[in-house]
């Protein structure tokens, strides 16, 4: 899903585009539920601020960007990162403090980024 012109209302009638947005929102929600479970198991160091209920915000803003655009989110940035297309496994590895994470496990949940 490449960025779109927000003035182009025809995308709101494009079923494939809307389906992709919905699938990304479901991905964000599922990711957040799993991250919360891992946090509850004591596998996540530090704290975590989830974006459950805010899936459309991250996915919708990400949909308006191109792959070359940068985005800086708040401490509830999982949805924005996933909406922009950051790899799910790399993000989860980051949250778990693994070297294979987007920031080699040093950023954690609140400092997710992928350059």
What is the role of each PLM region?
Residues 33-37, 43-115:
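Cofactor-binding active-site loop characterized by glycine-rich and histidine/acidic residues
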Residues 1-45, 67:
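Cofactor-/ligand-binding subdomain signature composed of acidic, glycine-rich
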């Amino acid at each position: 899903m490449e960025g779109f012109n927000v003035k182009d209302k025809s995308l709101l009638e494009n079923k494939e585009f809307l389906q992709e947005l919905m699938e990304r929102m479901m991905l964000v929600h599922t990711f957040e539920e799993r991250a919360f479970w891992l946090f509850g198991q004591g596998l996540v160091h530090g704290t975590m601020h989830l974006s459950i209920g805010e899936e459309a915000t991250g996915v919708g803003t990400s949909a308006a960007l191109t792959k070359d655009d940068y985005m800086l989110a708040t401490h509830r940035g999982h949805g924005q990162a996933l909406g922009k297309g950051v790899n799910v496994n790399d993000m989860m590895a980051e949250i778990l403090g693994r070297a294979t994470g987007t920031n080699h496990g040093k950023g954690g949940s609140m400092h997710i980024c992928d350059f």
